[in-house]
Curated annotation (Swiss-Prot):
<comment type="function">
    <text>Channel that opens in response to stretch forces in the membrane lipid bilayer. May participate in the regulation of osmotic pressure changes within the cell.</text>
</comment>
<comment type="similarity">
    <text>Belongs to the MscL family.</text>
</comment>
<keyword id="KW-0407">Ion channel</keyword>
<keyword id="KW-0813">Transport</keyword>
<keyword id="KW-1133">Transmembrane helix</keyword>
<dbReference type="GO" id="GO:0008381">
    <property type="term" value="F:mechanosensitive monoatomic ion channel activity"/>
</dbReference>
<dbReference type="Pfam" id="PF01741">
    <property type="entry name" value="MscL"/>
</dbReference>
<keyword id="KW-0472">Membrane</keyword>
<dbReference type="InterPro" id="IPR001185">
    <property type="entry name" value="MS_channel"/>
</dbReference>
<keyword id="KW-1003">Cell membrane</keyword>
<dbReference type="GO" id="GO:0005886">
    <property type="term" value="C:plasma membrane"/>
</dbReference>
<protein>
    <recommendedName>
        <fullName>Large-conductance mechanosensitive channel</fullName>
    </recommendedName>
</protein>
<dbReference type="InterPro" id="IPR019823">
    <property type="entry name" value="Mechanosensitive_channel_CS"/>
</dbReference>
<dbReference type="InterPro" id="IPR037673">
    <property type="entry name" value="MSC/AndL"/>
</dbReference>
<feature type="transmembrane region" description="Helical">
    <location>
        <begin position="8"/>
        <end position="28"/>
    </location>
</feature>
<keyword id="KW-0406">Ion transport</keyword>
<feature type="transmembrane region" description="Helical">
    <location>
        <begin position="67"/>
        <end position="87"/>
    </location>
</feature>
Length: 132
């Protein structure tokens, strides 16, 4: 059971996923800081000095912090757009590699050409026997 688990855990896909999760978590923190510390203060400044973190209203005893929600939406949009660009770049690079592989088809060797001619002759002979 232990050996089977080691095989599973050390597969390339599992390790890639683990690295992706760790990097994704760190990237999320960077984007959150970018949104809350850089983008939203600038947007607030452009809108007349609005501080989005303090935007809220009280409904009875409940406090609805819609400013924090707006920051979270902007945070999500930036992360989603970044992932979109990354996947688009990845697909573009992968597609180029596939095109290069298709272009690198080697020409048939003399033996392969000769075997192809023999195959064609045998097909012709079998076709003429079937007609007769």
């Amino acid at each position: 059971m232990w050996n089977e688990f080691k095989k599973f855990a050390l597969k390339g896909n599992v390790m890639d996923l683990a690295v992706g999760v760790v990097i994704g978590g760190a990237f999320g923190k960077i984007v959150s800081s970018l949104v809350s510390d850089v983008i939203m203060p600038l947007v607030g400044l452009l809108l007349g000095g609005v501080n989005f973190t303090g935007l809220s209203f009280t409904f009875g005893k409940a406090v609805v912090k819609y400013g924090a929600f707006i920051q979270t939406v902007v945070d999500f949009l930036i992360i989603a757009f970044s992932i979109f660009l990354f996947i688009k770049l990845f697909n573009k690079l992968t597609f180029k590699k596939e095109e290069e592989k298709k272009e690198e088809v080697p020409e048939p060797t003399k033996e392969e050409v000769l075997l192809g001619e023999i195959r064609d002759l045998l097909k012709q002979q079998n076709a003429s026997k079937d007609r007769a």
